[in-house]
Amino acid sequence: MSSPVLLHLWRGAGPVLLDAVLPPLCLGCNEIVGTPGSLCAGCWMQLAFVAPPYCARCARPFARDPGPGTLCGACSARPPRFRRARAALVYDERSRQLVLPFKHGDRTDLARACGRWMARAGAELLADADLVAPVPLHWRRLFMRRYNQAQLLARMAVAAAP
């Protein structure tokens, strides 16, 4: 068989064979899932995504809707130096179990999913942005972690933005 034929066969059968030998696993609990880089239904249901109503500046969730443009108490008392920010997830025990392994445990496989969530949460900010720049990492910390998490997230969020 010629190499183009083998390549065509591999492109068709390769992913199926690979999934049979190494099935995609949930990013949260390592259960088998149908799609690589995704969460199982149980882990998905445990995540608390930030949704309106929230602070117009920092996106801290409100218990009830105070109206458009309202700032939370912290932003009203001491305005942050940024104009707007968004968060994909409420930082709780479940989201912490995803964030910390990404940040400190070499779980770069989490970047794509987190980037998609960030792109969805910050769609209006990304649409208005001329540039997305990650926070630089000190060279010592970069040496210890081997990668800049903010840079990976920024790259993935921009790639996933509509």
Language-model-detected regions and their locations in the chain:
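Glycine-rich phosphate/pyrophosphate-handling loop used in enzymes and phosphotransfer proteins
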Residues: 1-162
